Regions:
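Bacterial N-terminal signal peptides
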Residues: 6-18
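N-terminal secretory signal peptides that target proteins for export/translocation
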Residues: 1-3
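Flexible, solvent-exposed loop/hinge segments and secondary-structure transition points
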Residues: 21-161
Length: 161
């Protein structure tokens, strides 16, 4: 009986020690409000005053939203969803739209808050998405929105390390 109790106690101590050894605090990079503002303002300036710009943090929370003069009301939601799509899949929303147009990946289009439209770009440090930007309402369409989003990110590229 004492042997069994000793074995059980020893095994419990071993499990507890191995569990706590693997537990540690995570260190994650995220987009700051200052960086989000610079990206959004640059994208708006590069594009047209009629666009809406949404910048999200790594968790998909809205950090900055700019609605240009004369922007349509629905562009707010479109910009946010484009940014969310880019963040979630760590690729431009236009690239994701192409990848999910046919085949096994089409089911991804039914996920909440994603949208198969161009204009969303992830903000990356290496392979890690720390945020994203989405634009909607550019007169040149989705390719212009993506170019403006990339210009916003380029403004802070030296800080993305």
């Amino acid at each position: 009986m004492w042997i069994r109790l000793g074995l059980v106690t020893g095994l419990a101590a071993l499990v507890a020690a191995s569990s706590s050894a693997g537990a540690q605090v995570l260190s994650e990079k995220n987009i700051s409000i200052k960086m989000a503002l610079v990206i959004a303002e640059t994208a708006l300036t590069e594009c047209t005053p009629r666009v809406s710009v949404a910048v999200l943090d790594r968790a998909g929370r809205l950090r900055v939203f700019l609605q240009g003069d004369g922007a349509s009301p629905h562009n707010l939601e479109l910009a946010r969803r484009k940014a969310y799509t880019a963040l979630t899949f760590r690729r431009t929303s236009a690239d994701w739209a192409k990848r999910t147009a046919e085949g096994d990946l089409t089911g991804q289009r039914s996920l909440a808050d994603v949208i198969p439209l161009g204009g969303g770009v992830p903000i990356m440090i290496g392979e890690e998405a720390i945020g994203s930007i989405g634009l909607s309402g550019a007169p040149g369409g989705q390719s212009q929105e993506e170019a403006c989003a990339k210009a916003g990110i380029a403004k802070v590229q030296d800080q993305l390390k």
